[in-house]
Amino acid sequence: HDATGDVADSIVAAKSAFPGDVTDCYRELLEPVLAAFEAAGADVGFADAGAPALWEPLCYLRALDPAHDLVGPDGRKVAGNAQYRTREAVVQHGSLTFESDPEAHLAPFVDPPIGPGAFAERVGGVSESPGVDPDRSAFVDRLESALVEWAGAEAGAWTDAERERAAELCDRKYAADRWVEGRDDPT
């Protein structure tokens, strides 16, 4: 991922609050993301049809899936999403391209089978849409506002006690041999 061209979002929610059907769940969890695109003036929606993967190591180049991939009017992917489900929770992570930089995405790989041109044919940036404010931080603010409104959340910050507790959990979990060797959570 590109540190400045990409924007990431994550939603963690009670599984019982959302549809059991994965596609329906994606549609509901992506409502605030689509609202942010709309607020920015970007014409973005779910892909109408799938497309084969161009190259698996890069998430933007994996197969285009109408269940969870968002595209611009030209059909290029602007956002991809993935879900992880436990017995009690749904964790959804999304990556969206605000400003596409094919060279930056491909740079970490030695001799990728896809060049910048093929990347640009599959992936588009939100900022490329006519009428969209090219200010990334303004878009991030719109996305944050849409997520807060959708979730009925209150903006806030971590307390010192919460940060200390999180650090303790990280230390206990990730320093444990049973986690490192077998992904057995000791917490």
Where are these regions (language model features)?
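Hydrophobic alpha-helical segments that drive targeting, anchoring, or assembly
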Residues: H1, V22, H93-L96
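A glycine-rich, hydrophobic loop/mini-helix early in the fold
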Residues: H1-G20
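Short connector loops at helix/strand junctions that flank enzyme active sites
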Residues: D2-D6, D65, V91
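Short loop segments at secondary-structure junctions
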Residues: A14-S16, D74-G75, S100-P102
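Flexible, glycine/proline-enriched loop segments at strand-loop-helix junctions
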Residues: S16-D24, E128-P134
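Long, well-ordered alpha-helical scaffolding segments within enzyme catalytic domains
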Residues: T23-A39
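Long, positively charged amphipathic alpha-helical accessory segments at protein N-termini or as interdomain linkers
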Residues: L34-L54, T86-T187
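Aromatic/basic-lined ligand-recognition segments
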Residues: Y60-R87, H93
